[in-house]
Amino acid sequence: MEVCIVKPDRIFFKEEADELLLPTNTGYIGILKDHAPLVTGLDNGVLGVRQGTTWRFLALLGGFGVIKEGRVNILCRDIQDASEINLEEAEQLAATAKESMTKSDSKKGYIENQLKFDRETARVAAAKMYKESAGGSPVFGN
């Protein structure tokens, strides 16, 4: 199936894939060739792309997915390939954002730090899956 992932500033990914695992607002969903038409909201999390026997992990920051006629279009706020994420840095940024949330004295500050925390949590999860995958099948939602 053809997969096209679009960020606000560019097309991030446009390739064929055999399987997708999408982080939806109600949990992970698997997409294979000839999937029934579907429009779904996407949550922050790890998007898995299988091409042959190789999995690629992407840190997805919300958006929408449209599945129709052998094509998957994903429009997202942001996305990053797990192979480009520094795990230790992402873990530190997540910890800092979480601490800042608890110390925030305004609703706006709390929400800004919550968004940072959610972003870094998705990046940490993607980086861990990339690091631990070493040829095996992914385990999503942990």
UniProtKB/Swiss-Prot annotation:
This is ATP synthase epsilon chain, chloroplastic. Keywords: ATP synthesis, CF(1), Chloroplast, Hydrogen ion transport, Ion transport, Membrane, Plastid, Thylakoid, Transport. The keyword Plastid applies. GO terms for molecular function: ATP binding; proton-transporting ATP synthase activity, rotational mechanism. One of its GO terms (cellular component) is chloroplast thylakoid membrane. F-type ATPases have 2 components, CF(1) - the catalytic core - and CF(0) - the membrane proton channel. CF(1) has five subunits: alpha(3), beta(3), gamma(1), delta(1), epsilon(1). CF(0) has three main subunits: a, b and c. The lineage of its organism: Eukaryota, Viridiplantae, Chlorophyta, Mamiellophyceae, Mamiellales. Produces ATP from ADP in the presence of a proton gradient across the membrane. Its main location: plastid. CDD domains: F1-ATPase_delta (cd12152). It is a peripheral membrane protein. InterPro entries: ATP_synth_F1_dsu/esu, ATP_synth_F1_dsu/esu_N, ATPsynth_dsu/esu_N. Belongs to the ATPase epsilon chain family. It is found in: Plastid, Chloroplast thylakoid membrane.
